[in-house]
Amino acid sequence: RVRYENAGNLTVLVVPASDTKPETNVLYQDQAYDMILIAGEFSKFQNELSCMREHLSDNGKLYVADANRLGLKYFAGCQEEYRGGYFAGLENYDKDPERFTEDDRHGEARVYTRKEYEQILKEAGFSGIYSYYPYPDHKFPSCIYSDEYLPGRGELSDNRRNFDRDRLQLFDEKKVFDTVLAEGLFGELANSFLIEAGNRTGEQRVIYSKYSNERARQFAIRTDICKKADGEKSVRKYA
């Protein structure tokens, strides 16, 4: 809300995952939304997905930003996104008391693979599902890729990010990412997803975005590569 407080054409409503009361949760009110964003802890909103779909406007979209259960960083030694523990998500949360440390901050929140996210959304009635890949992850991204604009060799070098927990460094993620890209597996092993679900229009859409979030706000620049329905591409820059 603070970030967009000067935007006259935008109203931001925040719904915590714990709010399931119809009298306070805006998702139960008789209103249509142009965009609904689930930023983390997607698993806690699964029972609300059908309700969200019903409350989207005709061209409205749902966006899901969350981690990938098969993200390369978890193979390399990062702990699980919400519950903690090494390799917990990779082993599909098969608890081992000697290695798995339950994290009460997020309760039973969990993350999914790309196919699992897409299947959950389809079962809730969503169509037009399209996956983007925030890098290094969905919490502190510097760029967002898509299947139509994938990273180049040597491009994924900013991998030492695991601020909330200790981590191991089992291999050089940059080198392994190069192999992943060469084998066409980036969509399965990206660290995080930004998933769009909803009715697609015939207008152009962004297939790649990069922004200099390491700079002071007045010097930051965002670069988007857009693609029209006829395949024509264009570049846009924002200061």
What are these regions (language model features)?
Residues A39-F42:
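Residues lining the SAM
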Residues F45-Y63:
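A short glycine-rich, Lys/Arg-flanked "PGG" loop and its adjoining helix->strand segment in the class I
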